[in-house]
């Protein structure tokens, strides 16, 4: 078992930064030791947003984006090493999720695409990288997502308490940790993605800090109901989605039937959409005693309050209360998945993704052995 220090790197669908986490991991323990949030340059963020919404690129432009993201991830790792005064030889491996630019697990040729050249990360950090975590699961008939429920189960499952873990990133996803039942999990729909897209277009702000703008508005019930009629919400699990589906174009199509709405009312309605679609899935699954929230949305007081109101009898809290920072959960999960890969252990849960079997995930990009001085 490759016990030791691992680094997890995550750039999610919210594109609010690169999360980098340092953890000590073995078969009995995952202990977070440090973390860092590394900024994504505005121009690079926009390039990723454009490709996620279907903008065509030349092969040269696509290759450049792949390289630039790899360099960005390497810089983020090196930033953490410098912050903690560590050397490459102190780290067993990096688990890098990459940047998802397209996710299409259905259709004649199911696929998912995460970019950010792992070779650049190895070359610039001198540390072995484990990446490309999702495509093996898709090759086995799965959704390739979500992968984090396995980590949630390992750290947060309880023998008697009915728990669910909710990650609200760009997309929201649930992990259902119910005693005596197989772990299940799936994407419920948009998390922060549509709220962030709307305030960016209307106010040139990256996100609605403390939901201040949404709290000034009122929910437009006809608009909310129209959005809730989207077939994704009624589709059975396993299911997963992303920015290629729930994007600004999706929102614009719904707004065409409602001209003249106040912008703040649209924001309030999008916050309600996130809360309602999550709570409906919690209730459809039989409910839970405790809903533990992580991701950027855990800091949205309006969404958190609405979840509590829509789920009476459920304690709505954050994973911070269990000692795991909600901001670092996903990066920590991919550090753990890298450890599982190097240990030859399966990283997916077929009960979650729908894959035909559990499997070791990812590809290993080995670093050169340290040079010895003669």
Swiss-Prot record:
Pfam families: AnmK (PF03702). Pathway: Amino-sugar metabolism; 1,6-anhydro-N-acetylmuramate degradation; Cell wall biogenesis; peptidoglycan recycling. It comes from the Bacteria. The keyword Thylakoid does not apply. Keywords: ATP-binding, Carbohydrate metabolism, Kinase, Nucleotide-binding, Transferase. GO terms for biological process: 1,6-anhydro-N-acetyl-beta-muramic acid catabolic process; amino sugar metabolic process; peptidoglycan turnover. ATP binds at residues 12-19. It catalyses: 1,6-anhydro-N-acetyl-beta-muramate + ATP + H2O = N-acetyl-D-muramate 6-phosphate + ADP + H(+). Coiled coil: none annotated. Its EC number is 2.7.1.170. One of its GO terms (molecular function) is phosphotransferase activity, alcohol group as acceptor. Catalyzes the specific phosphorylation of 1,6-anhydro-N-acetylmuramic acid (anhMurNAc) with the simultaneous cleavage of the 1,6-anhydro ring, generating MurNAc-6-P. Is required for the utilization of anhMurNAc either imported from the medium or derived from its own cell wall murein, and thus plays a role in cell wall recycling. NCBIfam families: PRK09585.1-1, PRK09585.1-3, PRK09585.3-2. Belongs to the anhydro-N-acetylmuramic acid kinase family. This is Anhydro-N-acetylmuramic acid kinase. It comes from Escherichia fergusonii (strain ATCC 35469 / DSM 13698 / CCUG 18766 / IAM 14443 / JCM 21226 / LMG 7866 / NBRC 102419 / NCTC 12128 / CDC 0568-73). The gene is anmK.
